[in-house]
């Protein structure tokens, strides 16, 4: 699969309205034509007023066909675009790939009703959303270290991989990895435990040292319609 990875900066205070429009119209229209929602996040700590939505397609041809189909859908250009566009200040997009060890989400995800356990669980979850820039040619070595060492260590402390992407078109030599936590306390406890794990300090860190150029991180929330790892 390939992924259309979109980061939008919204007008201050516009995130709830944008999220509601996505849930009520945009999501349905995209899914109707075959786009798979791989993630929907909004910033809590970091650069504020940002939303990230990630859409999966079988290949580049499928992406072109699906995007042409939903852009031509009357519900898109008559209802969704007029509602969403005035809320958006800037847009950035990348085409990303994902490795075999990353989760793949179904085209349509069940949306829990307000107040249900599933709804409350998603509202409590937090996501450590990390974008790393690497030296040219370094991503394969980093990917191997992540799969063989970092992911098993994080899993040991209840941390789940929500997404792992590397850039194909856009800003190159970048990896975005997204880690799911039950709540803020779990995030703090798990990160402390991972950092203190001897395998992390003795095996993982030496393998990736020297590969990175820059690191950026956000604390993000998801929505009731955003897919999350089991």
What is each model feature region?
Residues 1-202, 206-230:
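Short S/T/G/P-rich N-terminal loop/turn motif that feeds into the first structured element of a domain
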